[in-house]
A protein has these predicted regions:
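A generic structural signal for short beta-strands and their flanking turns/coil linkers
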Residues: 3, 16, 49-56, 68-70, ...
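Hydrophobic beta-strand-centered segment that forms part of the acyl-chain substrate-binding groove
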Residues: 36-73
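A broadly conserved detector of short glycine/acidic/proline-rich loop/turn motifs that flank catalytic sites
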Residues: 9-13, 64, 76
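Catalytic strand-loop segment that frames the active site of acyl-thioester-processing enzymes
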Residues: 1-26, 44
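HotDog/MaoC-like acyl-thioester-processing domains
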Residues: 1, 65-66, 75-104
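Hydrophobic residues in beta-strands and at strand termini
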Residues: 7-9, 60, 100
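Residue-level signal for inorganic ion chemistry
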Residues: 28, 74
Length: 104
C-alpha cells in the first residue's frame, strides 16, 4: 500500500495562537496527526477494519509556516510498518515510521 495527499494548516488555526505568538510554526504533533489520519483512512478503505497506531519513529527536519502547502506520502514496508515523509517547497519537513495493528 502507498499513497499521497496534500496538507495545509491555515493561519487562522487555533494552535498558532500559542505556537508561537508573533512567529507561528506548525507543531510536530499536528504533522504526526495528519500522517496517522491519512494512513488510517487508507487502511480502513482497503481492509475495512479499525486499527491501532504506534509512532515508532519521527524526525522533524524543518519548520513549517502557517498556510504552507505540504506533500505527505507513505508506503508499506511489507512488515506492518508504514514509512511516511512530509515535504514542503524544496525541502523535507518530516519523516517517520508508523506501526499499525488490530485493536485489542
Amino acid at each position: 500500500m502507498q499513497g499521497e495527499t496534500s496538507l495545509s494548516f491555515p493561519a487562522g488555526h487555533p494552535v498558532f495562537a500559542g505556537h508561537f505568538p508573533g512567529q507561528p510554526i506548525v507543531p510536530g504533533v499536528l504533522l504526526l496527526d495528519a500522517a496517522v489520519h491519512a494512513v488510517q483512512q487508507a487502511l480502513e478503505s482497503g481492509a475495512g477494519a479499525a486499527t491501532t497506531c504506534q509512532v515508532q519513529s519521527a524526525k522533524f527536519l524543518s519548520p513549517v509556516a502557517p498556510g504552507e502547502i505540504l506533500h505527505l506520502s507513505w508506503s508499506d514496508s511489507g512488515t506492518g510498518q508504514i514509512r511516511f515523509g512530509i515535504a514542503g517547497p524544496g525541502r523535507q519537513v518530516a519523516t517517520g515510521v508508523l506501526g499499525f495493528g488490530s485493536p485489542a
